Amino acid sequence: PLSTAAQSFYKTVSDYRGVDKSAAAQEMQDEGGGVIAAPVDVRKTAKVEGADYTIRDGSVVIAAITSCTNTSNPYVMIGAGLVARKARALGLNRKPWVKTSLAPGSQVVSEYLEAAGLQEDLDAVGFNLAGYGCTTCIGNAGDLTPELNATITQNDIIAAAVLSGNRNFEARIHPNIRSNFLASPPLVVAYAIAGNMTKDLMTEPVGKDTNGVDVYLGDIWPSSQEVGELMRFAMNSEVFKKNYADVKGNPGALWERVSSTEGQVYNWPESTYIAEPPFFADFEMTPKAAATGITGARALGVFGDSITTDHISPAGSIKEDGPAGKWLKDHGVLK
């Protein structure tokens, strides 16, 4: 539940830094008390958009509404737009250090957000259209500013990302972001405004309005009736028919400009990341008899927690100073 999100982040800090049973800074103590994260709580200044801001553990530096889980759910997309509308009306905005983006999986989403007048509100709080399809959840959000990257890495800050995708592996979203949270599109907007995962959005304000009055999540959260009134824009079947009537025959100008090879078999080029599988080297149409047993087998590797295939074969951006990055640079592959 949302009420335990901040506590979940403190557990992340504890997992990374170990635990400390001594008295810790009050702001770093989780709601349960007892064993708590080591009281590091480093706060450093980073220059973003020409101004200095304090970055600390839990600072949300990426907030993204992504394609993989929102296209088929107009209810939450309209909900996100209404959160943005209400926040905008109160003078709230994303925190300057939060990189925000909106990447629907379909142009239909853009059409009903525009028709409902919600895209303008999303734009106002930083959720501009970035494109369609896989972006942030595969590490393609674009990099953070050099100053922000340096502040995070040089001070071992556990920064956070909040996205409405379906992957939150360490470094999948960004190589320098270790704490990643999955949330609904409306909550992504709310956390972009709050700017930090250590806030309990059930009890603490997300920000202050133009008069300096605290604004809580309930003040900007839309009712079911408010969302329902705008659902008619998303339930227009003609929009879907228009966008998908001739996808194969007319895929669009960008796709038309992509060159491709022709033939029955793929012409494998020399590549640093695509290789012909070696088990096809002596491939025969008639399979050979399988061995009668397996002998001398051993485990290739035994790993601890929080290890995924992303650590073996990066699916997102690759660090230039890591082994894979150095190997690619040695082979003339530029970032």
Residue ranges and their predicted role:
Residues P1-K335:
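Fe-S-dependent hydro-lyases/dehydratases of central metabolism
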